[in-house]
């Protein structure tokens, strides 16, 4: 198939590899984006993780928690400019959207938009959005929301950088006091700062681990020095790298950012607080929203540059 400039641009943003390397990878894999990423990784030309995409959209993330702290929601609402994102009217509106979403029965944005606007039942959520677009003077979009409930504990939230990042953490616990709440808040801050992909290793798909091992083996075999090592040593290298990656992408395995010794894991920190409060505690899940993740603004000049180099 024909390899287009936009395909090269997308692969470059996902991997950080050079444009011509991206074109070569796409050509070799007949335009299959996922296979092209693996191709570059095997050649040592891309990072270990796909990048979700440049953070380019404006807006804010907001959270809302029920009075009993057992139900919470995180929402993202986008606008065109950072100037409007800081506008008081816009921020008040986003808080109202979050307050509506924490009580919604809708399972997706389409259903949510069709609901009656709680503060004015004469209009729907969608109609209220249209009204706000007229008032604000910019296009706006309620992009997504996620709800978390915990009947046997609490849900806590954390907002970072004025709404750039929002996190919910589901904590199952038989003791709810200030110490447990502070621990949960610290875990939410951890998730905001270090961007884990999973709560625990148990959530990581076995096929993902298997594919990572294949890629690591290919990298080693492509290295003249490393490939000469005994198989037992190579297996140890692969398992060591996998373990290191899991410690980076799994929240409970990460090094706790406030650890006094610089070594304590999040899991160990939670266990410590639980013991100090004679409580049974389990961090069951987290949800992390970052404003604009996976979205980007148009960059016609860059696309033209890619096209020019491809046709050279």
Briefly describe each language-model feature range.
Residues 2-312:
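N-terminal assembly/interaction segments in proteins that build large macromolecular machines
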């Amino acid at each position: 198939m024909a390899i287009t400039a936009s395909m090269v641009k997308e692969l470059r943003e996902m991997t950080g590899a050079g444009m011509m390397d991206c074109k070569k990878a796409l050509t070799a894999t007949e335009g299959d984006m996922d296979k092209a990423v693996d191709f570059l990784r095997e050649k040592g030309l891309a990072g270990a993780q796909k990048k979700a995409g440049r953070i380019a959209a404006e807006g804010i993330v907001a959270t809302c928690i029920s009075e009993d702290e057992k139900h919470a929601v995180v929402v993202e609402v986008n606008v065109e400019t950072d100037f409007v994102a800081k506008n008081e009217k816009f921020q008040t509106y986003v808080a109202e959207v979050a307050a509506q979403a924490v009580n919604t029965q809708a399972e997706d944005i389409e259903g949510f938009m069709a609901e009656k606007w709680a503060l004015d039942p004469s209009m729907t959520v969608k109609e209220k959005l249209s009204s706000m677009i007229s008032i604000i003077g910019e296009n706006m979009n309620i992009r997504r929301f996620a709800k978390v409930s915990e009947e046997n504990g609490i849900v806590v939230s954390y907002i970072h950088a004025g709404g750039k990042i929002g996190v919910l953490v589901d904590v199952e616990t038989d003791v709810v006091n200030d110490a447990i709440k502070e621990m949960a808040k610290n875990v939410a801050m951890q998730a905001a700062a270090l961007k884990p992909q999973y709560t625990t290793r148990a959530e990581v798909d076995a096929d993902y681990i298997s594919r990572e091992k294949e890629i690591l083996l290919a990298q080693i075999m492509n290295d003249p020095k490393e490939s000469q090592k005994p198989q037992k040593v190579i297996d140890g290298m692969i398992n060591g790298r996998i373990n290191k990656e899991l410690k980076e992408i799994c929240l409970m395995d990460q090094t706790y950012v406030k650890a006094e010794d610089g070594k304590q894991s999040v899991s160990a920190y939670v266990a410590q607080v639980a013991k100090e409060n004679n409580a049974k505690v389990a961090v069951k899940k987290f949800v992390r929203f970052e404003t604009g993740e996976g979205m980007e603004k148009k960059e016609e000049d860059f696309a033209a540059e890619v096209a020019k180099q491809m046709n050279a």
